[in-house]
Design a protein with these regions (language model features):
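Short helix-initiation/N-cap motifs at beta->coil->alpha
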Residues: 69-80, 168-196
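Periplasmic-binding protein-like
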Residues: 147-156, 256-276
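Secretory targeting and sorting signals
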Residues: 1-22
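Bacterial lipoprotein signal-peptidase II cleavage site
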Residues: 16-36
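Short, polar/charged alpha-helical segment
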Residues: 38, 45-68
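A bilobed periplasmic-binding-protein/Venus flytrap-type ligand-binding module shared by bacterial periplasmic
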Residues: 119-130, 233-246
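A conserved helix-loop-strand patch within extracytoplasmic ligand-binding domains
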Residues: 112-161, 262
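Ligand-binding "clamshell"
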Residues: 100-112, 127, 200, 205, ...
């Protein structure tokens, strides 16, 4: 059994082959291929693509499944593809991001329980300690609302900024910064672009998966690492709401929460750059 990886860049024209059958009945999702049911899952390449590949190569066949992975490097695409029926499920996002997508786009998408967490980190080519960030420094930050709030919370915990009283960190944006003692200048960019802009800024807050794809290790290379305890940003399997009770989808989610997957995550990312959430 082989996982098929279909890389899709943000600027590419999407020609997604839809193999998911929209419908709410049991076993309605996926494409039957002999004794196996093929599920097409959209995911970011690292670590979700790696985790799905492990499941496909080691666990899926015994559960009657064949997993085909469609890789995305643009966060705006997997939920649209799922909503449009081009894929059967996706695995790339956290709950605050899904909530913002549902509210903004009207998607009817349901999340399962978190599988893994990729801590955010602050990276710099020149600065070795967060305390050494100079006045008027330029710091790269996500431009999507849910991840921007996450980055601001991490910077607040490091006492680089202070958010206004009563602001929920999940919803925080740059205009919610009340105190900025070093007069840090924020440079907004798409999550996938932040690692590429490190030469142009003093430091940058980068998503764990994007950092790994760029050859950066959050736990080892970051000058500031997000706290993992009570973190609401775990990534999960998501499906169209009408398919949340589908038996094949539930089988896949069970595999993703299996002891084998937990051990795989702990062994492959023993440095803590990716953590199991179960």
């Amino acid at each position: 059994m082989k996982t098929k990886l279909i890389a899709i860049a943000a600027s590419a024209t999407l020609l997604l082959s839809g193999c998911g059958l929209v419908g709410g009945g049991t076993d309605s999702v996926g494409e039957k291929d002999g004794d196996l049911t093929k599920l097409t899952v959209g995911a970011t390449p690292v670590p979700q693509g790696d985790i799905l590949k492990f499941v496909d190569e080691n666990l899926a066949e015994d559960a009657g499944l064949d997993i085909e992975v469609t890789e995305y490097t643009d966060y705006t695409l997997p939920n649209k593809a799922l909503n449009d029926g081009d894929i059967d499920a996706n695995y790339f996002q956290h709950k605050p991001y899904l909530d913002s997508e549902v509210e903004g786009q009207g998607y009817e998408i349901t999340a399962f329980d978190p599988i893994n967490l990729e801590p955010f980190a602050l990276f710099s080519n020149d600065i070795k300690d967060v305390d050494d960030i100079p006045k008027n420094a330029k710091i790269g930050i996500n431009n999507d609302p849910s991840n921007q709030g996450r980055a601001l919370k991490m910077l607040e915990d490091a006492k680089l900024i202070t958010l206004k009283d009563g602001v929920d960190a999940v919803d925080a944006k740059l205009s919610d910064v009340e105190d900025n003692p070093k007069n840090v200048k924020f440079v907004e960019a798409d999550a996938a672009q932040l690692a590429r802009t490190l030469e142009d800024v003093d430091a940058s807050v980068i998503n764990g998966n994007n950092a790994l794809e760029a050859g950066l290790n959050p736990a080892e290379d970051g000058i500031l690492l997000e706290e993992a305890e009570d973190n609401p940003y775990g990534n999960f399997l998501a499906v169209r709401t009408e398919n949340k009770d589908d038996e094949n989808i539930k089988k896949l989610d069970e595999l993703l929460h299996s002891p084998e997957v937990k051990k795989f995550i702990e062994d492959k990312w023993a440095d803590g750059s990716v953590l199991p959430s179960f």
